[in-house]
Design a protein with these regions (language model features):
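Extracytoplasmic/periplasmic substrate-recognition and gating elements
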Residues: 7, 77, 99-101, 190, ...
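Short, solvent-exposed loop/beta-turn-alpha elements that line the ligand-binding surface or hinge
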Residues: 56-69, 133, 137-140, 155-180, ...
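Short helix-initiation/N-cap motifs at beta->coil->alpha
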Residues: 16-25, 109-113, 195-210
Length: 288
């Protein structure tokens, strides 16, 4: 924002919410006479609360920069939000430990492969000195990895099989596969399944940092916690594998990729402010 003002002379005011307080802060700010012209929503759930305030971005230069419509948040034909950070998640893998167990990342191309490797590591856990998976903690700081991210896979494959992109209720076609991958996690991890209720996201990360497990389900946002000054890993030590659940074309499966947060423009703002906001957003994605 500061750089944009320096280049254009257009003032940009940024209001930063405290951690975990974005929605509360947004509600307060939107009630003011000088409400924000640019805000964010957290996917379709967030859009449901704010879509009446969202300007249709269809046909704008900003929307024209999208490489795929899958990065737009739509309501019918209207583009009400545009993703501003694309992230991927999967099984972050300690390749050094994997090789100590006698395997390479290239050996794992399916759920059957993953199961074979994980159960072999568990059988030799005492000898190897590490487990297959970090703890799948069900504490609130960790459970989103399984209640949301892991759950996306059976839902995605059901949507693909049925040729739909929304539904009021899933049929549960692949819920057994969802159970199978989670069972693999909890039965081949650093801790007994009975301990999972109290395990946290920090526990899982620290287990991985301490070389206690080969696989850590998480995403690209974890990079700075694992690699860099004072961190134990280099880029060469890590890779990320797809989360295989035994469904679909596993040989060609990639990482789960998308965005959780989307930019939205306040349609209640003046025409001049809306245009100024669109200009700023376009600059953000095109400026060097």
């Amino acid at each position: 924002a500061k750089k944009y003002t320096e280049e254009t002379g257009v003032p940009v005011t940024v209001v930063t919410a405290a951690s975990g307080q974005y929605e509360t802060t947004l509600m307060s700010e939107m009630a003011k006479s000088d409400a924000p012209t640019l805000f964010q929503v957290n996917g379709p759930v967030g859009l449901a609360s704010w879509k009446d305030y969202c300007y249709d971005l269809s046909g704008t230069p900003l929307a024209g920069e999208l490489t795929s419509d899958s990065y737009a948040l739509k309501d019918g034909d209207a583009t009400l939000g545009i993703g501003y950070v694309i992230e991927s998640y999967g099984l972050i893998t300690n390749t050094t430990l994997l090789e100590k167990a006698g395997y390479k990342a290239e050996d794992i191309k399916s759920f059957a492969d993953l199961k074979k490797v994980a159960e072999d590591i568990t059988a030799r856990k005492d000898e190897l000195g590490f487990a297959a998976f970090t703890s799948a903690g069900m504490d609130g700081s960790s459970d989103w990895r399984y209640k949301t991210h892991l759950a996306n896979l059976p839902i995605y494959f059901e949507y693909q099989a049925d040729g739909i992109d929304t539904t009021d209720a899933i049929k549960g076609t692949y819920l057994d596969d969802y159970k199978n991958i989670f069972d693999l996690y909890i039965n081949n991890s650093t801790c007994d399944p009975a301990e999972l209720a109290g395990k946290t996201g920090d526990d899982s990360r620290n287990e991985f940092l301490n070389n206690e497990a080969v696989f850590f389900q998480n995403g690209s946002w974890e990079y700075n916690n694992l690699v860099g000054d004072g961190k134990p890993f280099t880029d060469e030590d890590l890779t990320m594998l797809p989360i295989y659940i035994g469904v679909g074309d596993e040989a060609n499966q990639g990482l789960c990729t998308g965005t959780e947060n989307f930019w939205c423009v306040n349609k209640e703002a003046s025409a001049d402010d809306i245009q100024a906001t669109l200009d700023f957003m376009y600059w953000c994605v095109t400026s060097e």
